[in-house]
């Protein structure tokens, strides 16, 4: 859409024309063929606060927390190489097939529960909620063992591109002048890809705690050396092609439980005109005003669950109405309502004593999660015209490459050399090496890969989500053969009736 804009000169010139972004429904034809696809039970287990490195007697234990993002990269089969029920459905010379996601259900196992997080040496100075008097001595180590129930979050983002998150990180000065030691560094809002295992906002903000908190004790253990990301809804909603987020489900809940301030020297002193100086211990000098609250997610109920429910996609929030480009789908999930941490105790000696002694037992903690993904996909067709191919190439050039569209060179009339053994010491070096396999552009990111290439089925009535979808569209189930005898044909009449003759 072209808009007029003003400039510094006195003459107003129209802006350069901008290509129009079209909705996928304008160039995609939807067929009446639907497929069901579902994953197996997806389980992960590990330590909820940090990863434990590998030792000689034990394998590495990963970090698995309820406050991590679970980003599933769902791999779909190529519909152009799929065995279709109707071979005349499309013309391979002019058409291509794509998948359209019309239904999804994310299943969650395990019971509801609250998993605590905390720090054995939490930077807690004064109780500023019920303070009797300020400590007045910030030279001693007054850190304490504090645990909290973090912010409650349920989140599900559906798209065909990786989700985008935002967080506060260390910025740079304008002239690259180093920040003096002890001064507050400049901050910058950074947008990055959300990967599987990244930490969510637990109530302490979305920031790079590893680089912005040198005490390593201002937040709980699970995020003290991590980066907490918050979904960048503004950027994903403004995505030009709408691939990052077809739609999303979100529920957040938090309140402040306790109020503290931080121990340490206050970097930015309060102006003298902002208060009247006090007298006595603890009031002159005044205590720290760096206040911080411990969050709480409050009560958890099954009435507020967004998972284990089917969702039908009729109209996406962006221009992509559920089309799975590159035969992939990204499901981003967060569910802190099932954050129970499993505490495990083992005896140090084979024989357990009759009296309890803490030194005779070892305590461990683990956290496990359980997911299941189910989808309903609709087979869609694209008629490739010159305009559509140019549009798709602008959006993502790899789409046409996967469809084997490219420039075909004319056959050469000259005689060329072809060596049998190319890589050996007797043959001269050949610079033109054979083409390597194409690299995955998302290989540098970490996702939970779910392969559904062999899990598609046309029998929707054999699956729970498929039956719900058939009920949604008003379609009838396929009759099961052999359960009833066929009704007799109307042409096969019983014995012929006699014609009554009047006397």
Swiss-Prot record:
InterPro entries given in the database record: Capsid_L1_Papillomavir, Capsid_L1_sf_Papillomavir, dsDNA_vir_gr_I_capsid
Region of interest (Disordered), residue spans: 476-503
GO CC aspect terms: host cell nucleus; T=7 icosahedral viral capsid
Domain of life: Viruses
Pfam families, per database record: Late_protein_L1
Composition-biased stretches (Low complexity): 484-495
Key word Nucleotide-binding present: no
Keywords: Capsid protein, Disulfide bond, Host nucleus, Host-virus interaction, Late protein, T=7 icosahedral capsid protein, Viral attachment to host cell, Viral penetration into host cytoplasm, Virion, Virus endocytosis by host, Virus entry into host cell
Principal cellular location given in the protein's record: virion
Subunit structure: Self-assembles into homopentamers. The capsid has an icosahedral symmetry and consists of 72 capsomers, with each capsomer being a pentamer of L1. Interacts with the minor capsid protein L2; this interaction is necessary for viral genome encapsidation. Interacts with protein E2; this interaction enhances E2-dependent replication and transcription activation.
Family classification: Belongs to the papillomaviridae L1 protein family.
Name this protein carries in UniProt: Major capsid protein L1
Provenance organism: Human papillomavirus 82
Gene: L1
């Amino acid at each position: 859409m072209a808009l007029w804009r003003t400039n510094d000169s006195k003459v107003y010139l129209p802006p350069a024309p901008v290509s129009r972004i079209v909705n996928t429904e304008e160039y995609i034809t939807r067929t009446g063929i639907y497929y069901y696809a579902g994953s197996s039970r997806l389980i992960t287990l590990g330590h909820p606060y940090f990863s434990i490195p590998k030792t000689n007697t034990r394998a590495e234990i990963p970090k698995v927390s309820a406050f991590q993002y679970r980003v599933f990269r769902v791999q779909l089969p190529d519909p152009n190489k799929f065995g279709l029920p109707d071979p005349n459905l499309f013309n391979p010379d002019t058409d291509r097939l794509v998948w359209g996601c019309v239904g999804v259900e994310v299943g969650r196992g395990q019971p509801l529960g609250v998993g605590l997080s905390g720090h054995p040496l939490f930077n807690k100075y004064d109780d500023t909620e019920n303070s009797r008097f300020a400590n007045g001595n910030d030279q001693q180590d007054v850190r304490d063992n504090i645990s909290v129930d973090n912010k409650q979050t349920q989140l599900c983002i559906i798209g065909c591109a990786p989700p985008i998150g935002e967080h506060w990180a260390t910025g740079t000065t304008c002239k690259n002048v180093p920040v003096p030691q002890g001064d507050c560094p400049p901050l910058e809002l950074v947008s990055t890809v959300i990967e599987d295992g990244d930490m969510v906002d637990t109530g302490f903000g979305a920031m790079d705690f590893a680089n912005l908190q040198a005490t390593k004790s201002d937040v709980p253990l699970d995020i003290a050396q991590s980066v907490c990301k918050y979904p960048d809804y503004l950027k994903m909603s403004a995505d030009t092609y709408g691939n990052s987020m077809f739609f999303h489900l979100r529920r957040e809940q938090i309140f402040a439980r306790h109020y503290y301030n931080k121990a340490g020297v206050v970097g930015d002193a309060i102006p003298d005109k902002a208060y009247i100086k006090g007298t006595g211990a603890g009031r002159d000098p005044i205590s720290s005003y760096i206040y911080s609250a411990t969050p709480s997610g409050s009560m958890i109920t099954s009435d507020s669950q967004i998972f284990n429910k089917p969702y039908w996609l009729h109209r996406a929030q962006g221009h992509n109405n559920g089309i799975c480009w590159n035969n992939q789908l990204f499901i981003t999930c967060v569910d802190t309502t099932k954050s129970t941490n499993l505490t495990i105790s083992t005896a140090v000696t084979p024989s357990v004593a009759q009296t309890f002694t803490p030194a005779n037992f070892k305590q461990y903690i683990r956290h496990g999660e359980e997911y299941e993904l189910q989808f309903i996909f609709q087979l869609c067709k694209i008629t490739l015209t010159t305009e559509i191919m140019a549009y798709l190439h602008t959006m993502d050039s790899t789409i046409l490459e996967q469809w084997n569209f490219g420039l075909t060179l004319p056959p050469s009339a000259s005689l060329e050399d072809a060596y049998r053994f190319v890589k050996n010491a007797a043959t001269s070096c050949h610079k033109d090496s054979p083409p390597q396999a194409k690299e995955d552009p998302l290989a540098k990111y970490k996702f939970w890969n779910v392969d559904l290439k062999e899990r598609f089925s046309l029998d929707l009535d054999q699956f729970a989500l498929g039956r719900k979808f058939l009920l949604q569209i008003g379609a009838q189930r396929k009759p099961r053969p052999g359960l009833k005898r066929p009704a007799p044909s109307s042409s096969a009449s019983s014995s012929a009736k006699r014609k009554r003759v009047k006397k």
